[in-house]
Amino acid sequence: MAKNKKKSIIKKPNPLLFFLCYILIAPILKLKYKTSYDKSGLEDLSGPALILCPHVSNIDFLLVALTLAPNRPTFVVSEHFMARPPVRWFLNKMHVISKKMFCPDIKTIMNILRARDSGNIVVLFPEGRLTCIGHSLSVTE
């Protein structure tokens, strides 16, 4: 029974790794892209929560993570990122939820529900790919 209980918990990202990424990446984005973050409406954000974002650039996950800090969100990412050993190590430490692209994936849904039950803030980019128009694509049946 205890083994089942432990398996059902989706941990939040590693706090030390998240903090190190924050202090290294935030200044770079500020200098290179002149980023600023509007956190209005996020002051009292706590889990469980599901955040849906349009995927318009390759640094979307960084911008979302920095905006949600000090909360440590759990991201849903494509499983093809897990094929590269250094990236896999990092993503495993960040406790991401992997997803098969462009097909129904019940394991991902179950892991999102486990993350919700664990009180996590889950971030999902529903398009599963970059959009070229800067806003969400229509949802297909």
Task: Spell out what each predicted region is.
Residues L31-E141:
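Soluble catalytic domains of membrane acyltransferases
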Residues M1-A2, V96:
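Soluble, non-transmembrane catalytic domains of enzymes that act on hydrophobic metabolites at membranes
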Residues K5-L24:
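Helix-enriched interaction subdomains in cytosolic or periplasmic regions
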